[in-house]
């Protein structure tokens, strides 16, 4: 029975994403029955990843990117250091919030409990409807609901699920500044063989480059000359020395795609360190797939065997 850490307490978007991963049979070693999985709530995303490293959990469901604020930096920073971890699945969740109050609340809202990531996604709504309210930081969206239930805030930015579990009333539902807000969650575990190639896959690595002119361009060239579609590049400080960075790269394709495998080998030769973060299915194609090397392989095989090769136009 897999143990899966997630940002708790119950009622967070992360829990909702985890439940959908379970029902979609996306958990290695699990099935679509949520009773076959043991949820392990944690106080933060880094704590969930550390639970996997320590063996207290088999996997962690964590947010990695949202369409409003971009990458979830605590997740990236935690993946870049410590014992290596690997991504096995992803799920994108539509996000909107509920402004929750206690059932007996009838008055002004002076304080609003909010997870900082959530507050950033409803900034305009708050400025319009609760301009005088003071934000009170919470550890998660569900923790914001708990703060309201405990009387530590007049209202909270939370989820409908958390409101139901804490017996709160919704002052406003479906609140979000951008109607197409989405958050991408990933399932992270200790290193293991990746899920099978599906043809709609994503591969992610974190690179440490030598401090030499053109090092980043040289690394990117290894992808471009193989026609690999790079979908994300982002840098984060190493926190060890000023001016040194870790570069996170996402590309379309799987470790079992020849072009991706060759690019990773080339990066391994060029970079000070290549941390493989996984190859996993995305469900839908998110860019141009890497080119097949079948024809080139057949051509090379004929050369090695001393057989005639057709002219370029006769393939």
UniProtKB/Swiss-Prot annotation:
Gene Ontology BP, a term: L-phenylalanine biosynthetic process
Record key words, sorted: Amino-acid biosynthesis, Aromatic amino acid biosynthesis, Lyase, Phenylalanine biosynthesis
Site (Essential for activity) residue list: 183
The name this protein goes by in its record: Prephenate dehydratase
Domain Prephenate dehydratase, first and last residues per copy: 3-190
Cross-referenced Pfam families: ACT, PDT
Catalytic activity: prephenate + H(+) = 3-phenylpyruvate + CO2 + H2O
Cellular component aspect of the GO annotation: cytoplasm
Assembly and binders: Homodimer.
Main enzyme class: lyase
Bilayer-crossing regions: none
